[in-house]
Amino acid sequence: MKTLKHILAATTLLVTLGFASEANAQVPLENFFKNPEKAGYQISPDGKYFSYMAPYENRLNLFVQEVGSDKATRITSETVRDLAGSMWANGHRILYIKDTAGDENFQLYGVNVDGTDPKAYTAFPKVRTTIIDPLENIDSLVIIGLNKRNPQVFDPYRLNLNNGELTQLAENPGNIQGWMTDHNGKLRVALAIVDGVNTQILYRETEEQPFRPVLTTNFKETVSFATFTPDNKMVYALTNIGRDKTALVLMDPATCEEKEVLYTNDKYDISGLGYSELKKKLISVSCTGHKGTIRHYFDKDEEAIRTKLEQKLEGYDIN
């Protein structure tokens, strides 16, 4: 027994010394601050290209590469500030944001996949740009937010990517926290905070009309519009009103009247919804279970694709 104790003590000492040696190994300071070699991969909507950010002159810039090719094209040449983010506007144009000297007043820019036709869309001093809706099915338009009128409040604008024209769609009184468009890119829903704690849904039939309050909920209640139906008349909504689990329902946005229950789970709240702009249909809903994500499919093709991916990528979480 004494010998065993000595062996254990010696082993413990060796392991401890090993850990101490690893702990004393210094990590170069620049490793914490240097740019990644490549980051932010995104596939173009048509699947022909992918983009990423990589260093050029010690600053993160945009690169585009055709799928199947080994050659990448740098399409921006920033040398003062890193690009803060990017997104595909359509199959041939990419949007990106950057600020000035770290002021976090991010401005929106655009450039073609070959680096031509660069545009500064929101180069306004001391004004910050946010993306409200990329309008995936409308190539030339995007909905953005600008605090141009009031530094503390973001108003919604429709931006024409071809000519840079900005059209203000509403004036935020200060308590609007979110906006929602229909499938034609029309801004028709607003989400506000009232009385400091309650949530209010506002609606309008057309952009020519003012927003009007439709429903106010407290912290115990949930009504969340996910997206409009393909005909833009109803909305798919997640709600727990009248039930103890959040369900997917068909709802009239003008009244918040529940028309039909589309899916509910006995154990879990609905946490996500999948809608295909290409197919113009609801494809799935998801719940967060205690062992992972639970999905219900409305589209058999989508289910088959995901099943095949899960088989090929066993052990990975596919989102």
Model-derived features with residue positions:
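Bacterial N-terminal signal peptides that target proteins for export
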Residues: M1-T11
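Peripheral, non-catalytic segments that deliver or gate enzyme domains
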Residues: F33-A39, P45, E57-L62, S77-A84, ...
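Sec/Tat signal peptide C-region and signal peptidase I cleavage site
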Residues: F19-A25
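Cleavable N-terminal signal peptides
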Residues: T12-L13, A23
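Active-site-proximal cofactor/substrate-binding loop regions of enzyme domains
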Residues: A72
